[in-house]
A protein has these predicted regions:
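N-terminal secretory-pathway/extracellular module detecting exported/lumenal segments
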Residues: 15-99, 107-140
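N-terminal signal peptide c-region/cleavage motif recognized by signal peptidases
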Residues: 8-10
Length: 140
């Protein structure tokens, strides 16, 4: 009983912070909604351009799920046929800090036979006109 009292004493002496302000609102809200500067975005785009399109380092950048569907619908294999797109899943964090979708693409007997294309759907107002290596984009 004495040991339990000694062990419980420090815990009982601590005041819970429940309901107490931990930081002024100005500090808590600082940085929210600021986004990236144009210079930062330009640096990120320049760095991404050093990598193949459709990778985590240079994902296909589209505006939302609609942009993703539109891009994949335009994707063509080397023989001009439409690529078959499998079930998409999270593919990891891309160079822009977003979770990229991984879209498995199959061209059957045409080149490239199979590829995993990474797509960043968080690039509002962006329409990429480049295709990953071995693919083409159909005109709009």
């Amino acid at each position: 009983l004495i040991a339990a009292t000694i062990v419980a004493s420090p815990v009982a002496a601590q005041k819970p912070k429940l309901g107490q302000r931990t930081a002024p609102p100005e500090k808590s809200m600082a940085g929210i909604g600021e986004g990236s500067s144009d210079a930062e975005v330009a640096q990120e785009l320049a760095a991404a351009a050093n990598f193949p399109v459709g990778t985590l380092q240079n994902p296909v950048r589209v505006a939302g799920p609609e942009g993703e569907r539109a891009y994949l619908a335009r994707l063509r294999c080397s023989d001009g046929t439409g690529a078959r797109v499998g079930a998409q899943r999270p593919g990891g964090t891309d160079s822009f800090g977003n979770v990229a979708d991984l879209a498995p693409v199959d061209c059957g007997g045409a080149a490239p036979a199979h590829a995993d294309i990474l797509i960043d759907v968080y690039q509002e107002e962006h329409v990429l006109e480049a295709a990953p290596a071995g693919f083409q984009l159909a005109p709009r």
